[in-house]
């Protein structure tokens, strides 16, 4: 009898085992709700701990294929370890996503209320964001449930919740007290639209058609080049920044200019004397060999400036317009008087690109414009604002990371933290060994406000609260303090993710139990922005009972990117984004077109995307269910490589779920109302007799268990999926189920009982083996199969059962060898049928030659299997000297299998049919050869198209060779 709690799950699964196809929409959402309500996702408190912290998705986001891919891997690991008896925690939560969230809400109030954030003021606008989060911020959580993620939702965190805010403040204050945080003026990526510094990850570099301007800079004090010229020609793609030049670099080995090093040029328009410096940054082979150096508006120039102590001049305001008066700083960002701050008044207030035209025109007017060349360049754009980013000198807060980087490098070097695959360690070391101080301030309203206050003299005080600042510094209540307006970089709070979500800075039981986490599953693109910073922050703030720095995770599993079928990156602007929920539930063509083009402002692009979508999905997208999607994702999870999404693969794995479903229907129909051996628990001798096929499938299953364990333990989810597919489809369904039919239709109760017992027990264990990847279908079938099996359950859901363990004693090598021989014998007969176009249902006489003792034993023991599955009329063993009639033949080991052809085929008709097939294939092969021999086609066609044509030719030639061989055989009859 099923237990009462188990009935709750069964009630969700209407008795549909006899339906021909599995319909995932019938059960997925209700089954997930039941799992969640019954608390199966929560830690049990028993066993060794195993934990994963999810990379927190943006609160503004919705599920994309990258999320689906990584989360399927994480859930597979969590379910696997839970079934291994571990005390599992999958910690989830969302990131407040500073700039992205602020932008979403700004757009919302502009569209709905015709207001800006300034109309609300800072506090009012932040209230609007919290309102928006309550209404819309949970979308991604609902979508994650659809993936089957076994997350303990009661522990969900948000990077702006009270506990996280406390942790962020604590970290900032302690770092400041340790002299690891400072405020300084340095060059940052400045977004002139959003008026904030942004990280490198938020900069999108795009190819762009531009120009290279060659400008003449007069040499000062009568200096001349080796060629006798009294000027240098500099080449630049950004002539507007020349107003901020503080040097000209030449290569110290360049014979044209090396004697000028230490001399000066008179900078046109501003009449500023600036030095000529020797630096390898100047390439003798590139441009004119002379490079203008603008430390205040170019990152490379800034490094050159530091090497040669060149002042930094800022010529732009926060809107990237020309200032009336320049700002001059030394290399440390301190104000200095190295140069006059005057700028030409005619350019003041001009946008940088308007100023570019005006400055070029002025150079032309003065006879200082040498030439303008077309030039392909890469320009940095804000990924959200869409405007060109400006390197700008601004006051920002920074973390001194050099001291933090050392232990973080050592943790990977000494094996405390392991990258999977290992090759990513080199990328990590490369970045860590050249690490720059981290700019952590952002000029936004939404985020963790920097816990720093200023008095009327701009002296800065850092503390957890204003009250603490006043108390620690004896500041009177009537003395006004102003809190810093900036907020912290989103990556600052997410760098604390693994330990802050477990209650730090308090010393909680969760922190002791689940930290460090076991594995981080993430993409290589954020090794620097998140992974490295998590390691640095965690090791600085967390120590074990012996005072040793604690790591955030033991392993880092790096995934590749999911790309479209052509290998291109998925993006809304390309219209090639695949929504995982559309793969699960299906979507009509009309709805898909609306989703991809509905909000597009560019009609031409929308038209192009519509055409592409109609071609790719003429009927829309069919529903495939969550299990098929998850199995597809694990099957392509080769370590670290990018993946081209393939709808055909997804369709293939939907067919796989149907195959499993139908196999289970067969098992249930042949066992549910019958004695499967479980009625004799004392196991009396003679109760059950296992056939060769039973012993073979049990051994094959054990080998599959071993392979899946090894694959999961080494993060080779692709190999685990491959092993499960191979066993389920090819061995269990295609062979074993067919081999059970002769036994089940015989009148031998012991053999029938043995086969039924094997059917239910192998299927039950197979469902547990597959469950981490395919949770829904396995739970559904397991609820019905388990009561028929020997397996003693622990709890009511498959997810809390024991994962199968490899048992070598169940691997009967002789049974495996014998059954493989039986399979090869049957395949040989089937191949002859196929080659000779003989009906599969026609019973055939078979003659055998070269039969050894082992072959004879196998024939005697398995005649029932051979006759049934190969559809044989008779099996005759020929004497050694006996010649058989004209026959089609095949070889199984040393054994020759002959099928006499007399009376089986119409020789002339078959030869005529083969001649037609040969003619057709020769034409096709000739056509493709001609195409591939066409130089014009080969030079212009994409590599994928050429590969497709080459595959066509190989297929045609292979088939042609087989048919020609077949023709020779038939002609000889």
From Swiss-Prot:
GO cellular component terms given for this protein: cytosol
Source species of the chain: Colwellia psychrerythraea (strain 34H / ATCC BAA-681)
CDD domains (UniProt xref): Anticodon_Ia_Val, ValRS_core
Reaction(s) the record says it catalyses: tRNA(Val) + L-valine + ATP = L-valyl-tRNA(Val) + AMP + diphosphate
SUPFAM superfamilies: Anticodon-binding domain of a subclass of class I aminoacyl-tRNA synthetases (SSF47323), Nucleotidylyl transferase (SSF52374), tRNA-binding arm (SSF46589), ValRS/IleRS/LeuRS editing domain (SSF50677)
Pfam families: Anticodon_1, tRNA-synt_1, Val_tRNA-synt_C
Chain location of the short sequence motif 'KMSKS' region per the record: 569-573
Designated name of the protein: Valine--tRNA ligase
NCBIfam families, per database record: PRK05729.1 (NF004349), valS (TIGR00422)
Covalent S-S links between cysteines: none
Cell compartments where the protein resides: Cytoplasm
Annotated binding of ATP, by residue: 572
GO terms, biological process: valyl-tRNA aminoacylation
Keyword check for Nucleotide-binding: yes
EC number: 6.1.1.9
Gene encoding the protein: valS
Domain notes: ValRS has two distinct active sites: one for aminoacylation and one for editing. The misactivated threonine is translocated from the active site to the editing site.
Subunit structure: Monomer.
Role, per record: Catalyzes the attachment of valine to tRNA(Val). As ValRS can inadvertently accommodate and process structurally similar amino acids such as threonine, to avoid such errors, it has a 'posttransfer' editing activity that hydrolyzes mischarged Thr-tRNA(Val) in a tRNA-dependent manner.
Record-level Gene Ontology MF annotations: aminoacyl-tRNA deacylase activity; ATP binding; valine-tRNA ligase activity
Sequence motif: 'HIGH' region, positions: 57-67
Coiled coil residues, start to end: 901-970
């Amino acid at each position: 009898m099923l237990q009462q709690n188990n009935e709750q799950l069964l009630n969700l699964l209407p008795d549909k085992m006899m339906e021909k196809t599995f319909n995932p929409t019938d059960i997925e959402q209700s089954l997930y709700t039941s799992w969640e309500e019954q608390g199966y996702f929560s830690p049990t408190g028993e066993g060794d701990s195993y934990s994963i912290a999810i990379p927190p998705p943006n609160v503004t986001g919705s599920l994309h294929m990258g999320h689906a891919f990584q989360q399927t891997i994480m859930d597979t690991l969590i379910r696997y370890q839970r079934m291994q008896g571990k005390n599992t925690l999958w910690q989830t939560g969302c990131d407040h996503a500073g700039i992205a969230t602020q932008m979403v809400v700004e757009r919302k109030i502009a569209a709905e209320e015709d207001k800006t954030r300034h109309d609300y003021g800072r506090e009012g606008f932040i209230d609007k964001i919290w309102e928006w989060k309550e209404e819309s911020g949970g979308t991604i959580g609902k979508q994650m449930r659809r993936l089957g993620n076994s997350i303990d939702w009661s522990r969900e965190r948000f990077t702006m919740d009270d506990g996280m805010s406390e942790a962020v403040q604590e970290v900032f204050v302690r770092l400041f007290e340790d002299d690891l945080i400072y405020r300084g003026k340095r060059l940052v990526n400045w977004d002139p639209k959003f008026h904030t510094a942004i990280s490198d990850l938020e900069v999108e570099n795009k190819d762009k058609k531009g120009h290279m301007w060659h400008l003449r800079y007069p040499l000062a004090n009568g200096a001349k080049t080796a060629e006798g010229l009294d000027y240098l020609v500099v080449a630049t793609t950004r002539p507007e920044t020349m107003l901020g030049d503080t040097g000209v670099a030449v290569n110290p080995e360049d014979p044209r200019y090396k004697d000028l090093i230490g001399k000066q040029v008179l900078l046109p328009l501003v009449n500023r004397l600036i030095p000529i410096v020797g630096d390898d940054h100047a390439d003798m082979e590139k441009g004119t060999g002379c490079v203008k150096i603008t430390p205040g508006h170019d990152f490379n120039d800034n490094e050159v400036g530091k090497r040669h102590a060149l002042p930094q001049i800022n010529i732009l305001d926060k809107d990237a317009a020309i200032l009336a008066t320049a700002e001059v700083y030394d290399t440390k960002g301190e104000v200095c008087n190295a140069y006059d701050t005057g700028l030409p008044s005619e350019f003041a207030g001009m946008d940088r690109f308007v100023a570019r035209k005006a400055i070029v025109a002025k150079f032309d007017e003065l006879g200082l414009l040498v030439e303008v060349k077309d030039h392909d360049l890469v320009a940095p754009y804000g990924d959200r604002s869409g405007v060109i980013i400006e390197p700008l000198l601004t006051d920002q807060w920074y973390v001194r990371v050099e001291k933090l980087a050392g232990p973080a490098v050592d943790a990977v070097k000494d094996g405390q933290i392991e990258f999977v695959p290992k090759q990513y360690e080199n990328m990590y070391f490369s970045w860590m060994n050249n690490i720059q101080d981290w700019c952590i301030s952002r000029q936004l309203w939404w985020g963790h406000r920097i816990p720093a206050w200023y008095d009327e003299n701009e002296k800065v005080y850092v503390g957890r609260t204003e009250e603490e600042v006043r108390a620690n510094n004896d500041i009177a209540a009537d003395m006004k303090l102003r809190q810093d307006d900036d907020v912290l970089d989103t990556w600052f709070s997410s760098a604390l993710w693994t330990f802050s979500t477990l209650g730090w800075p308090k010393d909680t039981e969760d922190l002791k139990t689940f930290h460090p986490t076991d594995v981080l599953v993430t993409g290589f693109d954020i090794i620097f922005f998140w992974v490295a910073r998590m390691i640095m922050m965690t090791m600085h703030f967390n120590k074990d009972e012996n005072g040793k720095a604690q790591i955030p995770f033991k392993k880092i599993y790096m995934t590749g990117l999911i790309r479209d079928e052509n290998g291109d990156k998925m993006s809304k602007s390309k219209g090639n984004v695949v929504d995982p929920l559309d793969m699960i539930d299906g979507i009509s063509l009309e709805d898909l077109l609306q989703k991809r083009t509905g909000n597009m402002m560019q009609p031409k692009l929308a038209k192009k995307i519509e055409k592409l979508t109609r071609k790719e999905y003429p009927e829309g997208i069919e529903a495939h269910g969550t299990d098929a999607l998850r199995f597809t994702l694990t099957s392509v999870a080769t370590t670290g490589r990018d993946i081209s999404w393939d709808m055909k693969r997804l369709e293939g794995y939907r067919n796989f779920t149907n195959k499993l479903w139908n196999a289970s229907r067969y098992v249930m129909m042949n066992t549910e109302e019958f004695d499967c051996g479980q009625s004799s628990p004392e196991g009396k001798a003679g109760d059950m007799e296992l056939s060769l096929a039973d012993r073979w499938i049990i051994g094959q299953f054990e080998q599959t268990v071993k392979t899946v364990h090894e694959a999961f333990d080494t993060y080779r989810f692709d190999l685990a999926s491959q092993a499960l597919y191979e066993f389920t489809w090819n061995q269990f369904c295609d062979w074993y189920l067919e081999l059970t039919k002769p036994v089940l239709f015989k009148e031998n109760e012991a053999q029938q009982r043995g086969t039924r017992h094997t059917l239910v027990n192998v299927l039950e264990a197979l469902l547990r083996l597959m469950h981490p990847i395919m949770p829904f279908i396995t739970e559904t079938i397991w609820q019905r199969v388990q009561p028929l099996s020997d397996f003693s359950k622990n709890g009511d859901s498959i997810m809390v059962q024991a994962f199968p363990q490899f048992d070598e004693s169940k691997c009967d090598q002789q049974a495996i060898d014998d059954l493989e021989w039986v399979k090869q014998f049957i395949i040989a007969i089937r191949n002859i049928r196929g080659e000779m176009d003989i009906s599969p249902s026609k019973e055939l006489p078979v003659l055998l030659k070269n039969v050894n003792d082992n072959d004879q034993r196998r024939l005697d023991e398995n005649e029932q299997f051979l006759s049934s599955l190969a559809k044989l009329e008779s099996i005759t063993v020929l004497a050694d000297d006996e010649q058989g009639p004209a026959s089609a033949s095949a070889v199984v080991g040393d054994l020759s299998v002959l099928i006499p052809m007399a009376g089986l085929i119409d020789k002339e008709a078959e030869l005529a049919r083969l001649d037609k097939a040969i003619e057709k294939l020769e034409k096709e092969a000739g056509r493709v050869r001609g195409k591939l021999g066409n130089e014009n086609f080969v030079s212009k066609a994409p590599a994928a198209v050429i590969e497709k044509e080459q595959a066509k030719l190989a297929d045609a030639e292979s088939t042609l060779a087989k048919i020609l061989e077949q023709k020779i055989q038939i002609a000889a009859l």
